[in-house]
Swiss-Prot record:
This is Potassium channel toxin alpha-KTx 6.10. GO terms for cellular component: extracellular region. It holds the Pfam family Toxin_2. The record marks K48 as: Basic residue of the functional dyad. It is found in: Secreted. Transmembrane segments: none annotated. InterPro entries: Scorpion_toxin-like_sf, Scorpion_toxinS_K_inh. The modification Cysteine amide is found at C59. Inhibits Kv1.2/KCNA2 and Kv1.3/KCNA3 and weakly inhibit Kv1.1/KCNA1 voltage-gated potassium channels. It comes from Opistophthalmus carinatus (African yellow leg scorpion).
Amino acid sequence: MNAKFILLLVLTTMMLLPDTKGAEVIRCSGSKQCYGPCKQQTGCTNSKCMNKVCKCYGCG
């Protein structure tokens, strides 16, 4: 019973994880390093360096 529940929980978690294929990881040490790459991806410079990875916000 417990093994079935754990297996079901693992399978459900795996299916709910976001698909990150094709997403480009941009490494950074400061937010200024994110402006150019994010402008190429989204068309806007709205970005932030968090945990040494750029987070692009896009326009709006």
